């Protein structure tokens, strides 16, 4: 790579620096250009020479001073930077150091000395170091800090002078009483609180205010509704009282002509009976032309009498009742909405009564359902117990039948048992429970009889026992068949 870099610019420079018509001077210029290129190549080689070294894999607890002690004696260098461990790179928490040497020979000696050198930490763990060229060969420049022009000029600053003046006045105020100071502090706090207004706080305050206004409106409406209801009830009651009074007055007025009528009632009754009898006779008879005209005249006269009576009653009522003034009539006209409010109140009462009736019906229906469920449960339990009893009866019958069958089987085995009993009587051994047959009947005093009686009598007794068993089995069968 170095040879290519050396040859390429030479060829270019030669072609460019050969002007036409200048032969002798061209040789001198070519020699100067070759010298300049050699200097540039040397500078490039110096720049390309690696001088910055990094020491990696150092213990995480190692400090800069401890590392410098280990590296003594240090060769000539112009840059030394130490970086402690980084906890974010766990578990690879190692320290490292960068050194820029002035001489290339010192780099080789340093590498031979510290590459693979084992460092120990506080806990005695070993950390073999690695020495190699740094990937970034440039060194950080040390910035020369310029002196600030404002250093030592605070006494001349006008703001500082104002501060000193205000500070002196504050000291004078401190001599005042604590009450005045508290008042001043409270006033300042109030001003600060009043000034602290953000859009969020204003929004929340407005929201709270709107809620309070809505609540007040609701309360006011409820109060008005209650007042209106009370007024409607009061008016309705007053109207009812007034109507009752009017009805009572009318009844009193009607009673006066009724008393007068009571005196003439017997005559009227006689006339009525006579009229009924005459009417019946007339109905039986065929009406003639003259009679029909007379009947029409009588009916017309009756109608006129009835109309006259109704007019007299109306006139009597109007005379008896006091005349109302125009103001009262005007007051009565706007009473229509009051009547409507009374009707609404009555309708509400009717709806409430209907709701109560519906609730009572639902409760009765639920009670009936519960009673039906309880009855069904009782029926189910009764049926269950009845079925259980039937099953028990069937089981008892089956057991009785099984006993009868087993008795028959014992009769067939009886002959074989006779021979065994004879041998047992001869031996006169005690019979144990395990040696007894499964279906042998209990015979009290059988052992004493066997000892006293000869073997022939024992056989007879065995035959009689077998006959008894047969008879008992037959009787059981008969009972089972009858059942």
Curated annotation (Swiss-Prot):
GO cellular component, one term: centriolar satellite
Biased composition, class Basic and acidic residues, residue ranges: 1-14, 34-50, 209-268, 285-314, 323-409, 417-437, 457-483
Domain of life: Eukaryota
Tissue specificity comment: Expressed in testis, uterus, prostate, heart, muscle, brain, spinal cord and placenta.
Residues the record lists as Phosphoserine modifications: 310
Subcellular location: Nucleus; Cytoplasm
Main location: nucleus
Effect of residue 451 to E: Abolishes NMD
Residues carrying Omega-N-methylarginine: 447
Necessary for interaction with UPF2: annotated span: 30-255
GO MF annotation, one: RNA binding
Keywords: Cytoplasm, Disease variant, Intellectual disability, Methylation, mRNA transport, Nonsense-mediated mRNA decay, Nucleus, Phosphoprotein, RNA-binding, Transport
PTM annotation (Phosphothreonine): residues: 169, 198
Biological process terms in GO annotation: brain development; mRNA transport; neuron projection development; nuclear-transcribed mRNA catabolic process, nonsense-mediated decay; positive regulation of mRNA cis splicing, via spliceosome; positive regulation of neuron differentiation; positive regulation of translation
Pfam families per record: Smg4_UPF3 (PF03467)
Region: Necessary for interaction with RBM8A and for activating NMD, residue numbers: 430-447
Region called Binds to UPF2, residue ranges: 52-57
Span list, region Disordered: 1-51, 206-483
Matches recorded under InterPro entries: Nucleotide-bd_a/b_plait_sf, RBD_domain_sf, Upf3, UPF3_dom, UPF3B_RRM-like
Clinical disorder: Intellectual developmental disorder, X-linked, syndromic 14: A disorder characterized by significantly below average general intellectual functioning associated with impairments in adaptive behavior and manifested during the developmental period. MRXS14 patients manifest intellectual disability associated with other variable signs such as autistic features, slender build, poor musculature, long, thin face, high-arched palate, high nasal bridge, and pectus deformities.
Family per record: Belongs to the RENT3 family.
Protein task: Involved in nonsense-mediated decay (NMD) of mRNAs containing premature stop codons by associating with the nuclear exon junction complex (EJC) and serving as link between the EJC core and NMD machinery. Recruits UPF2 at the cytoplasmic side of the nuclear envelope and the subsequent formation of an UPF1-UPF2-UPF3 surveillance complex (including UPF1 bound to release factors at the stalled ribosome) is believed to activate NMD. In cooperation with UPF2 stimulates both ATPase and RNA helicase activities of UPF1. Binds spliced mRNA upstream of exon-exon junctions.
Classification via PANTHER family: REGULATOR OF NONSENSE TRANSCRIPTS 3B (PTHR13112:SF1), UPF3 REGULATOR OF NONSENSE TRANSCRIPTS-LIKE PROTEIN (PTHR13112)
Name of the featured protein: Regulator of nonsense transcripts 3B
Species for this entry: Homo sapiens (Human)
Lineage: Eukaryota, Metazoa, Chordata, Craniata, Vertebrata
